[in-house]
């Protein structure tokens, strides 16, 4: 009987990508098969995230639950990866000695060797959280995909060192993946039926990959090359930094139809004073100028962003500046949360006199405004016929198909031949706007 692998993933899309590659890697090296039940697993991996508050405690709470599984099955192998693993390293083994392996985002390709060492000599403490550049992509097997969409990591790390952010310390400095390596993966995925590619990086628009001739390829050029791959009809990218949003990338919205009419561009705050304290490297007006230039090329584009509320020193005036920016741009959605200090970052040492109750109240006001704007945009879509990439059945209603619009809205609809439409584009007339999705009717039986 094949041995089983269980992976629990916290955090961002980059972690989702890394977890999928771990499954591919261990499937090839040790014939491990994925399971959805941790109780059936022979190997359990926890892929961690350090962005949100109490990330470490969340990890150790999960490891505490798995201690019982280890006691019942001493042969069970438990590994911890991701950004918390980079931060904590050996401390994870000290606090949770039942953990067998600790590895960082840049060393997940060494999992087969670590697993062999663990199984061969149980007393060896396997901890590897180094930053070996982009080496891991040279050792990972070709990805497998059974869906219409896929993530492709094009770079690792971040060199911006925003004062609130732990990513440069857990993922390392920016390193771009070679151009040919990215394109080989995209072509391989397209051959498996993938229609939409999401290019990933902590600061993806800083991508500067070399081709075999030694020429530098930026993100705009990469997107153009991905768009030329037969079968790829949609391209997204995330996450971006405003400073790196180049003229060529802006112009891509007028030149590459496969690039979707949706952009997630984190701004974090609408106050120049707070942006400077965050060391973001740009002003509000510089940010707005980029979005206005993109909107001139794509009038129907939707923008989403990230917002941190209650950054140390934030005044009521600073908060209102953020609210004004939200209304001015007409953001479609956001990831927004109350600031919490990340250990080892400069902002963790700043005085913070704003009461937590005030921060939570501001967050509620911001989220209410954004929810209103989201619904306004959704309601304007009612009556439109939208091009939907069908990704599968609705999790809440298996009788309905589910897919996404260009502006990243989930659309649920019924069809007489549902299984034949999965993985294809169809035209759907939007009939109803709901808080988190849209409903529609199939406008044409044709798939393409």
From Swiss-Prot:
Please name the PROSITE patterns in this protein's record.
MTTASE_N, MTTASE_RADICAL, RADICAL_SAM, TRAM
What's noted on cofactor binding?
Binds 2 [4Fe-4S] clusters. One cluster is coordinated with 3 cysteines and an exchangeable S-adenosyl-L-methionine.
Q: Please provide the record's keywords in A-Z order.
A: 4Fe-4S, Cytoplasm, Iron, Iron-sulfur, Metal-binding, S-adenosyl-L-methionine, Transferase, tRNA processing
GO CC terms of this entry: cytosol
Which residues bind [4Fe-4S] cluster 1 per the record?
12, 49, 83
What does the record give under GO molecular function?
4 iron, 4 sulfur cluster binding; metal ion binding; N6-isopentenyladenosine methylthiotransferase activity
Q: What is its EC number?
A: 2.8.4.3
Outline the extent of the TRAM domain: 379-444
- Is Phosphoprotein one of the keywords? no
**Pfam short name (any one):** TRAM
Where, subcellularly, is it found?
Cytoplasm
Q: What residues does the Radical SAM core domain cover?
A: 144-376
- Provide the residue positions that the database annotates as binding [4Fe-4S] cluster 2: 158, 162, 165
Cofactors, names only: [4Fe-4S] cluster
What top-tier enzyme class does this entry carry? transferase
Q: Which reaction does it catalyse?
A: N(6)-dimethylallyladenosine(37) in tRNA + (sulfur carrier)-SH + AH2 + 2 S-adenosyl-L-methionine = 2-methylsulfanyl-N(6)-dimethylallyladenosine(37) in tRNA + (sulfur carrier)-H + 5'-deoxyadenosine + L-methionine + A + S-adenosyl-L-homocysteine + 2 H(+)
Q: Please report which protein family the annotation says this sequence is part of.
A: Belongs to the methylthiotransferase family. MiaB subfamily.
Q: Which HAMAP family match?
A: tRNA_metthiotr_MiaB (MF_01864)
Q: Provide the function of this protein.
A: Catalyzes the methylthiolation of N6-(dimethylallyl)adenosine (i(6)A), leading to the formation of 2-methylthio-N6-(dimethylallyl)adenosine (ms(2)i(6)A) at position 37 in tRNAs that read codons beginning with uridine.
NCBIfam families attached to this UniProt entry: miaB-methiolase (TIGR01574), MiaB/RimO family radical SAM methylthiotransferase (TIGR00089)
How does the annotation summarize its subunit structure?
Monomer.
Give the protein's recorded name. tRNA-2-methylthio-N(6)-dimethylallyladenosine synthase
Question: Could you tell me which species this protein originates from?
Answer: Chromohalobacter salexigens (strain ATCC BAA-138 / DSM 3043 / CIP 106854 / NCIMB 13768 / 1H11)
């Amino acid at each position: 009987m094949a041995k089983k692998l269980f992976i629990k993933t916290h955090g961002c899309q980059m972690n989702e990508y890394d977890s999928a590659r771990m499954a591919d890697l261990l499937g090839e090296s040790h014939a491990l098969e994925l399971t959805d039940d941790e109780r059936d697993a022979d190997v359990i991996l926890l892929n961690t995230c350090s962005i949100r508050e109490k990330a470490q405690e969340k990890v150790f709470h999960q490891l505490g639950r798995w201690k019982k599984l280890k006691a019942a099955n001493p042969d069970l192998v438990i590994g911890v990866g991701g950004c918390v693993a980079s931060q904590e390293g050996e401390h994870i083994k000290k606090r949770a000695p039942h953990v067998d392996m600790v590895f960082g985002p840049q060393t997940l390709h060494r999992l087969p060797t670590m697993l062999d060492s663990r199984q061969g000599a149980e007393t060896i403490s396997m901890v590897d959280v180094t930053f070996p550049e982009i080496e891991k992509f040279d050792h990972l097997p070709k990805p497998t995909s059974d869906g219409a969409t896929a993530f492709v990591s094009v770079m690792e790390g971040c060199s911006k060192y925003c004062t609130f952010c732990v990513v440069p310390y857990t993922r390392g400095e920016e390193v771009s993946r070679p151009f040919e390596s990215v394109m080989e993966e995209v072509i391989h995925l397209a051959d498996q039926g993938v229609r939409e590619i999401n290019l990933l990086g902590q600061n993806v628009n800083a991508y500067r990959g070399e081709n075999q001739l030694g020429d530098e390829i930026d993100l705009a050029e990469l997107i153009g090359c991905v768009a030329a791959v037969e079968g790829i009809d949609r391209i997204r990218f995330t996450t971006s930094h405003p400073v790196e949003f180049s003229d060529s990338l802006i112009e891509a919205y007028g030149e590459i139809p496969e690039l979707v009419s949706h952009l997630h561009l984190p701004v974090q705050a609408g106050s120049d004073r707070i942006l400077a304290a965050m060391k973001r490297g740009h002003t509000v007006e510089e940010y707005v100028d980029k979005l206005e230039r993109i909107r001139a090329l794509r009038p129907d584009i939707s923008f989403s962003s990230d917002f941190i509320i209650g950054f140390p020193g934030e005044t009521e005036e600073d908060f209102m500046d953020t609210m004004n920016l939200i209304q001015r741009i007409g953001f479609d959605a956001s990831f927004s949360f109350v600031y919490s200090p990340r250990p080892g970052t400069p902002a963790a040492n700043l005085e913070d006199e704003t009461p937590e109750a005030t921060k939570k109240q501001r967050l509620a006001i911001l989220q209410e405004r954004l929810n209103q704007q989201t619904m306004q945009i959704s309601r304007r879509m009612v009556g439109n016929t939208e091009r939907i990439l069908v990704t599968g059945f609705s999790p809440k209603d298996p009788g309905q198909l589910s897919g996404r619009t260009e502006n990243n809205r989930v659309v649920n609809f019924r069809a007489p031949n549902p299984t034949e439409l999965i993985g294809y584009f169809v035209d759907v007339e939007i009939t109803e706007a709901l808080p988190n999705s849209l409903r529609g009717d199939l406008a044409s039986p044709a798939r393409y």
